[in-house]
Amino acid sequence: MGLKNLFEKMEPAFHKGGKYEKWYTLFEATYTILYTPGTVTKKDSHVRDALDSKRMMILVWLALFPAMFWGMYNVGGQAILATSHLGSLTDSIANNWHYAFSEAVGATLTADAGWGSKMLLGATYFLPIYLTIFLVGGFWEVVFAMVRKHEINEGFFVTSILLALIVPPTLPLWQAALAATFGVVVAKEVFGGVGKNFMNPALAGRAFLFFAYPAQISGDLVWTAADGFSGATALSQWAQGGQIALKHAVTGQEITWMDAFLGNIPGSIGEVSTLMLMIGAAIIVFARIASWRIIAGVLVGMAATATLFNLIGSETNLLFAMPWYWHLVLGGFALGMFFMATDPVSASFTNKGKWWYGALIGVMCVVIRVANPAYPEGMMLAILFANLFAPIFDYLVVQSNIKRRKAKAA
């Protein structure tokens, strides 16, 4: 008997009145991940598409894999480089289970480590964070689905990996669990669940950590997974000393634009490589999951605002001089632009609204980065701010169309 036949034989027991009725949500989620649902349209439908929401979310999830794998490689590489510089490898193996496990399975943790060893060490940091977020957030998804008696939506595949990619590799697991809980319960389920949340759940979870536990989500101690190592992000370095201050904290070598573009710098796990994020973005834009209008709007808004600050200039604030192409590759700008600003639920729906929504994100990101003396990153707050304005943009566009048609018909 094939697996599909086994599922079909078991299915009646999970429907209403069946022995396992209360577990239908879990049965349906498992079946529809493996196979296309057997449901058919009984009445007129507004949209027909071969790509259902389940496949769409899984495709976005897969599109984040390039950034995820590079993030693991970079985390491991930065950690090995730092421990080699500090001469603390022996202490790290003795006191840090990530290093001890990696060495036990054959990884080389010295300066001549290969890509496999770097990937393995990075995976020991990323995978526990991701699994914690996935399991805790998934638990809340299942609880609310069972209480409301509806299907489990695969949107959490995307939320979980995004949240795991926008945090430092040293984040405590209990804080990852709290972030997942806040993102799923407070930012999504409280407002009715999938399709009804007005803000991005992953960003809401990170914002919760930023305001509740700033020491573990910002500063100089959290970006490199090496005990006792301190190193500022490239954005913080620019804020303190301008472009000339962009130096690798370990080697002292200059950080070039290409280093930042490829992702050879410390930072949140999945936001460092603009190249890998572009590869994933090409997939979801080509599949028409992400709106190119939003991406273009963000880019135009950022470039225009950065250029304006360049023209104004400042002798005391060195971020005024940062060109737009540096804004693109530093911090969380690329990840936010490609995968968070384009969230179809919390973004604007109308075509014109998408342009204004994207432009607002680009403008606010640069304004927060440059004009905020306490925190040189602005993409998270910019997107959450724009989420609040997305319905307003759509309303104004619709009202404008109504007025234009009335005037034309008069």
UniProtKB/Swiss-Prot annotation:
GO terms for molecular function: FMN binding; oxidoreductase activity, acting on NAD(P)H, quinone or similar compound as acceptor. InterPro entries: NqrB, NqrB/RnfD. Its EC number is 7.2.1.1. It is a multi-pass membrane protein. It is found in: Cell inner membrane. Its cofactor is FMN. Its main location: membrane. Keywords: Cell inner membrane, Cell membrane, Flavoprotein, FMN, Ion transport, Membrane, NAD, Phosphoprotein, Sodium, Sodium transport, Translocase, Transmembrane, Transmembrane helix, Transport, Ubiquinone. The chain crosses the membrane at residues 56-76, 126-146, 156-176, 267-287, 294-314, 319-339, 355-375, 378-398. GO terms for cellular component: plasma membrane. The modification FMN phosphoryl threonine is found at residue 233. GO terms for biological process: respiratory electron transport chain; sodium ion transport; transmembrane transport. It catalyses: a ubiquinone + n Na(+)(in) + NADH + H(+) = a ubiquinol + n Na(+)(out) + NAD(+). Belongs to the NqrB/RnfD family. NQR complex catalyzes the reduction of ubiquinone-1 to ubiquinol by two successive reactions, coupled with the transport of Na(+) ions from the cytoplasm to the periplasm. NqrA to NqrE are probably involved in the second step, the conversion of ubisemiquinone to ubiquinol. Composed of six subunits; NqrA, NqrB, NqrC, NqrD, NqrE and NqrF. NCBIfam families: nqrB (TIGR01937), PRK05349.1 (NF003756). This is Na(+)-translocating NADH-quinone reductase subunit B. It comes from Haemophilus ducreyi (strain 35000HP / ATCC 700724).
